[in-house]
Amino acid sequence: VQDGKRFTRAAMDDEMDRPLEILDPLGWLGGDITDKRILCLGAGGGRHGPMLANAGARVTVVDISPEMLRLDQELAEARGLQVETIETSIDDLSMLAEAEYEAVMQPVSTCYVPDIRLAYRELARVMQPGGVYISRHKQPTNLQIDLAPTPAGFVIDTPYYHEGPLSPAKRPGPHREQGTMEFLHRWGDLLGGLCEAGFTIEAVTEPKFGDPSATPGSFEYRGHHLAPYIQLRARRTEKPSATETLWTPASPQ
């Protein structure tokens, strides 16, 4: 927040005037969001919450950082918008009611919680059946390699099955923010945990941040060799009935 870095830049006036074009270029929210109850998991520092409110949504923003929430409130008040802000971790939504939200938008933030499956269970509880969850996550390899390449290329120096918080980044930057504690979540947790929590994954994209002409050692150069994030659209499923079963090849006919 203090440095005004890539992930804490407040929305500019021209962005506030076309919020869905900026935040939802793929149309995953389904168009008009007037009066929709939308939860933002991670404030984005004066960005997602105020922009969605400017598009007509009733917005709640959750973030563990009071400074990030302050940026949201300041921008919302300057625009005459209503944005509810709650200081808590994304894996503790106990203050929110069950099935309260029709949609959830989450910028990159699951890397800051130790148990992503717990965060997904909390998310499932507060979402309405049929609600859409749009999120970005750091993919595992993004947290396994350093920013700068060696003469032989990029080197994986963190085990895939690493447990606990990651060591501080050797070269802090957009791929590893300075002053944060991050956790590596494996694909089985990122995707499998989401399905187990009661979601159906409908779409997966890899936003492009790479530039082959960028200076080696830069975020853009690294992004050309490794997509740093995945973006998901998932649907909160109806609660399954007690009679439903899963057929497997070993099941009796």
Residue map of PLM features:
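Acceptor-substrate binding/catalytic loop of class I
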Residues: 141-145, 174-189
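Conserved class I S-adenosyl-L-methionine
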Residues: 132-169
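A short SAM/SAH-binding and catalytic strip from SAM-dependent methyltransferases
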Residues: 102-117
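Conserved alpha-helix/loop element of class I SAM-dependent methyltransferases that forms part
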Residues: 6-36
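A short glycine-rich, Lys/Arg-flanked "PGG" loop and its adjoining helix->strand segment in the class I
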Residues: 117-132
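Class I SAM-dependent methyltransferase SAM/SAH-binding core
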Residues: 36-93
